[in-house]
Amino acid sequence: MMIQERIAGLRKYMAQYGLEQVLMGNPININYFTKMGARRSDRATFLYVTQTEAKILVNDVIGYTTLEGMDVAFHTDGDNVCEAIAMHTIHDKPLAVDGEYPAKWLIPLRDFNAATDYILGDRAINLQRAHKDAEEQQLLREASQMNDRVMKRVRTEVFHDGITEMEASRAISKMFVEEGADMPGWCIVAFAEGSADVHHHPGNAQLKEGDTVLIDMGSPRKGYHSDMTRPFFWKKVSDRQREIYDLVLRANLAGEAAVQPGARCCDVDAAARDLISEPGYGKYFTHRLGHYIGLELHDPGDIIGGNTDPVEPGMAFSCEPGVYLPGEFGVRVEDLVIVKADGTAEILNHDSKELEILGL
């Protein structure tokens, strides 16, 4: 989808929600709609969209002269940025801004009567970003393929008796660059009872026989993120570990299978959550089933009980049920999925999900 098609999609949602003008200051939103490489800076860049125009407002030092189908309006270091922005807005209409629009630019903007009111435009922006076009879908596939390659190496190249969580995490992070990532990967490595901490920080715990080894990892590739979680067991596995692993894996598969035409985000969450709740472990599944993913690791949007939005073609999100037993261990199994044109799930991760005992 080219830039103008993304802008056209935004305009459709603007009309749906009664927004006549939208001003964006979040560089991620700006990059999605322009591909201009905007970044957070004291020389801020803005994107202004109405039903008839799309305009980049940028400091002339940054130097953009043309962008596909868009006007470019420059201001200088000596200009009052908010006054410059106000010159381009419709003053007798509400102005929608994105949720991360910097307050230091928004509050002074009111002094220039740039609009009758200021409202959030995130609903329209986020719905457009949620529907990945063919280019984005391919980039997400490639990022997940990279994650699969790293996880394959992890099984044989990282762990040994006595290695610490931090040492393992650092070793895995380096592998991402070797496999084509934009930067070293992020990696949660948790041993034993640490795996019962949903967002554990790798520390000095040392690997020992019988430990659950939980690995949650990813990195962007060509700007689009990967994310995958796999649990392993070191040298042996108990019956209780095996029971929980089997339960969580079945919940993961149930969530993925629930992606069907007409399904809502809350339905997908319920398919996995109900399976875990049935044998009495529901209170140990303490988080949403998944999050949207794309230019951000956590794109706006959740697969969660309260989200009644329909699951639609082009959406990309994680499916990551877990059971966390305090003081014992935790198990989470996570894949990324894209909703296909027929409304079902394409699983992006092809790394094995069968129970594995490492170190034998």
Q: In which residue ranges do the predicted regions lie?
A:
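Active-site neighborhoods and metal-handling regions in enzymes and metal-associated proteins
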Residues: M1-L360
